Amino acid sequence: MTEIKEIDTIPDEPTADRPENRRKKRQTTPFLKPRDGLLIAFFVPVLVMICIFVQRGIFPFGERCFLRTDMYHQYAPFFSEFQYKLRTGGSLLYSWDVGMGVNFAALYAYYLASPLNWLILLCPKKFIIEFMTIMIVLKIGLSGLSFAWYLKKHSQNCILGVGFFGIFYALSGYMAAYSWNIMWLDCILLFPLIVYGLERLVKEQKGMLYCVTLGLSILSNYYISIMTCLFLVLYFIALLIMEKPGPVRKYVDSCVRFGIYSLLSGGLAAGILLPEIYALQSTASGDFDFPKAWSSYFPIFDMIARHIGNVETEIGLDHWPNIYCGVAVFLFFLLYLACKKIAVKEKAVYCGLLLIFFASFSINALNFIWHGFHYPNSLPCRQSFIYIFLMLFICFRAYMYLDETPKKHIAIAFWGSACFVLLAEKLVTQEHFHFIVYYVAIIFLAAYAGLMYLYKDGKRTVCGFLALTLVAIEASINMSVTSVTTTSRESYTSDNEEVRILKDSLQPASDFYRVEKKTRKTKNDGAWMNFPSVSLFSSTANADLSKFFKKLGCESSTNAYSITGSTPFVDSIFSVKYALYSEAVSNTELMMYLRESCGTYLYENLYTLPLGFVLSSDIEENWQYEMDNPAEVQNDLCLVSGADEVLVDAGGTVNKNTFTFTPDEMGEYYVFVMNKKVKTVKAELPTGQKSFSNVDRGYLLELGTLAPGTEVKLTADEAGEQLNAIAYRFSEDAMIQVYDRLNQSPMHLTSWKDTKLSGTVSAAKAGMLFTSIPFDKGWTVKVDGEKVETRKAFGAFLAIDVSAGDHVIDFSYFPKGLKTGGLISGGSIVILILLWFLRREMERREARKRMEQIRNMQQEAEDDPDEEPEFEEIPDLDDEDLTDTINNRKATTEEQL
């Protein structure tokens, strides 16, 4: 079989004139060899990150840990729940430990789908944070390696320089800003492989690498993969433009191949992807609102200036892209434009792609499209890693022709770059830019230009070592200055052992229960410590449940809801039977102390409603739960149930930004702030001062137990806003009344597992069996062995209609879309395998055909030794024409077969 050599994506001059073939000794030192480029691209970023961790005192080098933003609040708890399920044999389809009960298959797909995450099974529970940290460092190193490997495929020979560019890809401004976002990193490290796979698909008609790597990227994180897929469409068009013109059939075939393998890659991930898509439709992000008017956030000059190193990264609500990838890009980009060895068509295409990204960073509508037809809630320009990839590749192309670059071009590039930096100091007004960064950038530019001059003067022995040192220093300084913020590991894990002991003491449980920590570290403490809980902070949060929480006076937002603001009545409805306190509190008629472990206290709520109970059929019509005041909503449910109001008006006086009231009797007090412009409130209590943040989210402010006769004063931080508020005292007697009314026909569970519930209910009369299970179409309910239709109660919960009498109820859960997605994935795998075998068979047939031709020619020569064999005249072709000829003949052979 004839071996087809690797084809460079970018059309170059004949092999003999290749720049890399004229500099085999470039950057070779006793310490560094050209083949070391790949090792450098992996190990230097890893060592840089380890050094930064040592300097920051990150465990085991100190008491700190690398838990930043979502890694603190979401990733660590979800990793803990994932590990817990793997070790205990729990279902990966549903979890009661997160937000009242969630579709864990969707949560897994969104946060945990990286295949590397399964290694957590080998990690001790107490080192989950360190497992995540190690995975981040490993993925950063692999990102550098994959990009260097991609560049190596374009240089034909091992050259040390691929390692330098790999370092900047791994330690770019994007990584500095988002390296903590472990669920994105798989897509970053796979991206160079995907792009190379697409190039092979277009050049060599081989789609296996493209399909598998893109499928793995989509599986690992669908969100970043949306941006990858959008770019692949653009890059596919770019590759066709850079191809040598051919017949229309050639372009049609390429488009068909691209479409088939792209669909197959999505199909490979469908088993994970479809349940996630269905779940996301029930989130607040499920809405679609394309911008009505187009606008620009900032000028292109300011964006380009963010290539300067040591500039503070942007992860907030501003839209600035994090695009730093070494200040040398200023030099190399100008050298790229000036290089006569690089085709004008190529320059036009790649510069066009860069302009598209600049427009996407700055124009609101394009920003909306790139982020999956949504505006990002902080963490801007999440597609900027693609821009960095393009910019570094462009610069590498200039680097490949450094031998042919005149010294005057280097001088012009340096002075042009230096002038831009000085101009940026004058024009850029962002607070991210400290004045010193401009001068540091010029120093590094001068150092890079000096190295180029040394190289051009023939002093190449030390150039490789000096270049590596300079690149490592620049990248590490930027990473150290702009990245790796830390928090206290001790404070995050301080009470873990105590909580574990107390929650384990509740097992085995005879009936369903939920637990809440009154002093939480995150809204996902249940997932972190593996106990059934109520609160949740996740992008997969159910929007209807968030709205219902707010109606009852609990804290909620776009992607979170929590028990903050709940009354004992709300706790009872949500089956919160146990509470964990960080300090001892007195027993009441409603709550009883159970046990304590090293300063953590476990209490039982004595009047907790079961997971399900029968309500009258007309309660949804009678209960006015759409009112603005959550206290009135709770009281109305009491009245509808035939009980007294649980929240009694305690009066109070409003005076500008203050609200005061005096308790008339001992009890637990709450305040509801009606002015939504007030965000922060300070309460002066007999026990001291208490602060409340995010008050505009509409939750009840819990003031605790207050004695009569002592004035309580609340003050809004917003001095110009009037603190319109109402104070309430919680009535324990009314609570017992309403509990007795609602608990007349409870559901008693006989079995309780992740995806299956069984129980009995004795309904005094026909009604609605309400459950505090969030509504999900994945639930199937059977009554007395017969499947019944489920419905959404109060806009958020799972319910069914039951007749009077005794019934056996069975619940089972299977995520919507999982079966269909699994079938699609299985079918895609089969098709991909068939395509692989088909291609191998075609190549074998072609090889056999050629061998047969050779044997025939040999036989003819033996039969008539005097006759000279005739050979087909082969035209004189250059590398590019030869490549096209081979590819066209292979395509023709495939069509015939």
Where are these regions (language model features)?
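Active-site-proximal, structured, solvent-exposed surfaces of multi-pass membrane proteins
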Residues: 30-32, 78, 639-872, 894-897
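Hydrophobic alpha-helical membrane-insertion signals
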Residues: 24-102, 487-527
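Membrane-embedded helix bundles of polyisoprenyl
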Residues: 45, 136-154, 158-243, 254-277, ...
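Active-site lumenal/periplasmic loops and adjacent helix-entry segments of GT-C-fold
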Residues: 55-155, 159-192, 216-220, 311-319
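Start-transfer (signal-anchor) and selected internal transmembrane alpha helices
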Residues: 1-58, 253, 257, 457-467, ...
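Extracytoplasmic/lumenal acceptor-recognition loop(s) of multi-pass membrane glycoenzymes
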Residues: 470-490, 504-574, 607-610, 614-636, ...
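Periplasmic/ER-lumenal interhelical loops and adjacent helix-loop junctions
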Residues: 69, 73-86, 115, 254-257, ...
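Contiguous transmembrane helix-bundle modules in multi-pass membrane proteins
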Residues: 205, 224, 348-368, 374-498, ...
